[in-house]
Amino acid sequence: TVERGPGAAAGITYLTRSDFEGTFPRVADADRVMDDAVAALNLYDDEQVAADAALYEDSLATSFVQPLVTSAGSYWQLGEDGELTDLGYELGSDYDDARWEIVLDFVSLSDMQHLVLHGYLATGQISGIGKPLTKEVDGPAQVGSFNQLSYGVGYPAPTVLAQTWNPALAREVGRQLGLEAATLGVDGLYAPCANLHRTPLGGRNYEYFSEDPLVCGTMAAQVVGGARDAGTYCFLKHFAVNNQDSYRDSLYTWLTEQSLRELYLRPFQIAVEGGTTGLMSSYNRVGAVWAGGSRALLTSVLREEWGFEGAVITDYADHQDYMSADQALRAGGDLYMDGVFRNGSFSYGFTQEELSSARGTDRAAAATSYLTNLRRATKNVLYVWLEARAANLDYNTAAAEAGTAPIERPIKTAGPNYVGTALALADAVAATSVVAWAHRALRRRRESR
């Protein structure tokens, strides 16, 4: 279980195969309302910040001062004119390259904060190192989001794909989704989904592959791999135990570690071992801890046990106070999806002046925690973009050697999309005309009666 220590599971009866008679519930318990004071104990506060900072008491940050360099030299540029530089390709091919630390030294503190805090449908441009503005959209069966002007092809639901049990077909679907994304000017997808069909009533079942962890993980890994072949990265979602859509916000999800690992984490583990570089955390809690702020989940299991290399983004976070950007950062999260109505911010962040003055004070560990995790998150976001582009270049090299067709991404250029905007306006005018015509026709019919 998530809680540890004496009395952690007091009063909780877990269903077990060894004693169905004694543990299977006969009568549903009455609903209980959590007291506000109890709920507040599970919000990220000064005490939890101090506990996270204590992990850094015996370590030092690379520097308490993030260099204020506005532009790196040409060698340190990661991208140029819509394509990767040699350095960008090399860093995208090697997460542990020592030059990462030098690249991070060319990113200002404000650029890091902006990148990490504002992850809704995009990641920000960092012109000093040649990182362009990137664009991300949904979804599991179609490239596009509710607020996008252009959509890709609508494919059958992932459940149908899973029923084929054809990993090669899933790979081709991923390649097609990745290429469509590139054609529409999209860099990454909030897809696919690796949650399970726990109940037929699940509100997102149409986005999920299966009730079986092996099927789910295998198909998800292949879709992600296919998208990477096309140079498009994926944020596999929702990590973890997001098996209902109604009332999932801040939902306290209780389960044994056995069921967590064998069922609900297994699909994600398969996908990570298959090369997935992006994950989206979930709204719910695992035990009492928000999944997007769980160090046990995002660091201990995901990175230290599974060896995950990449970035974790929160789900849409513009309407929930429990989804703390500070908690996510220190737990191992990398991107905060702040949304339309909330401007992402850190309540326990540091300015450059505060970092400079923290050395030798009782705030030194907290400053180290903040800057170390901020640099890590920046690296991870950059890596996800670079790794997908490098994977596409590798795919095309292998295709050329094998005499097969490459997957050429259209070069993405800056500036407005005049063609797309014009088509969208034409659609809007046409739709308005149809509605107006229908209104007039209905009115004439009524007047003729």
Question: Where are the regions a protein language model picked out?
Answer:
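Glycoside hydrolase catalytic-domain context in secreted enzymes
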Residues: 1-449
